[in-house]
Amino acid sequence: MNSYLLLPMVSLLTCIGQLCQKQAAQCWEQPQARRLNLTLRWLAIAVVSLGLGMLLWLRLLQQLPLSVAYPMLSFNFVLVTLAAQLFYGEKATLRHWLGVAAIMFGILLMSWHL
């Protein structure tokens, strides 16, 4: 599989895993009778997403040098920030977005190396 396709898939699966972990953490606010089942469901989805992401990551490392692939994984910061705003209503400050922009600029610089 093409490394340009694998990298976004790894990032997306990692982002999904992070969102599921956040959802599992929020399940502790549920009534005690439902808490454990909901938490375990979200954690199971997180483990599957992160596990698939790890397998694709291993495949990606067969195609790209670690020094190129790993910095590009920083795109996860962008995805998780956007998803946190969309799904959880979390606010990001201007300083946070400037940091995200710096990460995106770094990703652009890394892509020129390929």
UniProtKB/Swiss-Prot annotation:
One of its GO terms (biological process) is lipopolysaccharide biosynthetic process. InterPro entries: EamA_dom, Flippase_ArnE, Small_drug/metabolite_transptr. One of its GO terms (molecular function) is carbohydrate derivative transmembrane transporter activity. Coiled coil: none annotated. It holds the Pfam family EamA. SUPFAM superfamilies: Multidrug resistance efflux transporter EmrE. GO terms for cellular component: plasma membrane. Keywords: Cell inner membrane, Cell membrane, Lipid A biosynthesis, Lipid biosynthesis, Lipid metabolism, Lipopolysaccharide biosynthesis, Membrane, Transmembrane, Transmembrane helix, Transport. Residues 43-112 form the EamA domain. The chain crosses the membrane at residues 38-58, 64-84, 94-114. Its main location: membrane. It is found in: Cell inner membrane. Pathway: Bacterial outer membrane biogenesis; lipopolysaccharide biosynthesis. It is a multi-pass membrane protein. Belongs to the ArnE family. NCBIfam families: PRK15051.1. Translocates 4-amino-4-deoxy-L-arabinose-phosphoundecaprenol (alpha-L-Ara4N-phosphoundecaprenol) from the cytoplasmic to the periplasmic side of the inner membrane. Heterodimer of ArnE and ArnF. This is Probable 4-amino-4-deoxy-L-arabinose-phosphoundecaprenol flippase subunit ArnE. The gene is arnE.
